[in-house]
Amino acid sequence: MDGTLLDSMWVWRQIDVDFLDRRGFEVPSDYLEMITPMGYYRAAEYTIERFGLNEKPEDLIQEWHGMAAEAYAKKVELKSHAKEYLLKLKKAGTRIAAATSSAYELIAPCLERNGVLECFDAFVTTMEVPHGKDFPDVYLEAAKRLKLSPEECLVYEDIYKGICAAKSAGF
């Protein structure tokens, strides 16, 4: 969702800067690459471990969500031609699921404001499955919710580890 349909990566880059700055750290050059395929919980654990924070993963996730909520609700836009493409797929009867690392509570207002929420038949977040996008769990669950086999699905993904994970499961 982020980076494929939504032009939202700038939000997460800014959250990384602000979040770590509040704790006296700069964002390491490899940080975004490391946490992107992880789900929220694993990213929070990684952040706590990497920076030696005395905080709970749930608290980091809550803070990140709070920082992102307004941007998603009011500022994040669709990528160029995404709306037209989704509407064309929907009109053709294609079932569409979103397999995302973002919380539904963040993306739903953005998709609704941009006029495409109703294009989706299912949403699966990495918080609902055991692993992040570096494993096929989120893609398999999306196919299951669409009542399709992996071979009947097409995955659009901008994370290399996610592409590899989906491919390993037969997508």
Regions inferred by a protein language model and the residue ranges of each:
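Active-site neighborhood of HAD-like aspartate-dependent phosphohydrolases
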Residues: 1-33
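Helix-loop "lid/cap" segments that line or gate small-molecule binding pockets
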Residues: 19-20, 39-54, 110, 142-143
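Metal-dependent phosphoesterase signature
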Residues: 26, 46-84, 92
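Short beta->alpha linker loops
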Residues: 35, 39, 64, 77-81, ...
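Substrate-recognition "cap/lid" segment bordering the active-site pocket of phosphatases
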Residues: 75, 97, 103-154, 160-168
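Short glycine/proline-centered loop/turn elements that form peptide/ligand docking sites
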Residues: 83-88, 159-162
